[in-house]
Amino acid sequence: GLFVFGSNDYYGPKPKNPFSYLFKDGGRRKLGPELDWKGLHKSLTGIGWLDLNHSREVIKINDTIIEARGTDDAHLNLDNYSEVAGLPDKKAHLAIGVTHAPYLRILEAMSRDNLDLIFAGHTHGGQVRLPWIGESRALTTNCDLPTWRARGLTREPNQPWLHVSAGMGTSPFARIRVASPPEVSLLTLEAGF
C-alpha cells in the first residue's frame, strides 16, 4: 500500500460551526489535539506500506512498472511539491500521484508532470450533497476543488484522471452525511485507459 498524511492524521477533531465549511477560511485552521502520527507512520511502514509524503517510489508488479509520488497535507500547507516534481520515469507504465487534500495547486503541478492518475480524499465526498442539483452537487469540498469533483473518478480535458474517495468518516461534532454515503474505493486499472 501507499500512504500520505492528512490533517486528521496529525490533529484530532475540534468543535466548530459546521456552516463555516461553506466559506473560505483564509488558511486559518482550528486544530484539535495533536495525534500520534509518528506511531501511525511506524505502524504503516512496519507492515510494508510506502510513505509517499514528499517521496517518489518505483514499484514493479509482475511486468508492470508504476511510479508513485505524493505530498504531505496541502490543507495544513505542509505540501512541497518541488521535492517530488519532474516527469515520470520513462520506463513507468503508469504514473500516479497521491495527496490527501486535492488543492488545485497540487493537481496542476501533477498534471504538468504528466501523471496519469491522482488519488485524493479530504472532501468526504462533500459530506452533504444536494441530490436534485445536477448529478448530486456537493455543498463544499473544504478546499479549492470544484464541488462537482468532490467524489469519484473525474477528468478535465488534457488532465490526469482524479479519484477522490468520499471516505468513511465524519466529524464527531457533525455526524451527518446527506446523499454522500461512506465509501471505500476499489479501482481496477486496465491497459490503455
Located regions from the model:
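Core catalytic region of metal-dependent phosphoesterases/phosphodiesterases
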Residues: 1-59
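Active-site neighborhood of phospho(di)ester-bond hydrolases with catalytic His/Asp-centered motifs
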Residues: 1-7, 52-54, 96-100, 117-125, ...
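Solvent-exposed loop/turn segments at secondary-structure junctions
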Residues: 7-11, 57-59, 73-76, 101-104, ...
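Short, electropositive alpha-helical surface patch
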Residues: 25-33, 69, 173-186
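N-terminal post-signal-peptidase region of extra-cytosolic proteins
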Residues: 53, 78-84, 139-148
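Active-site-proximal loop/helix segments of hydrolase catalytic cores
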Residues: 74-89, 97-118
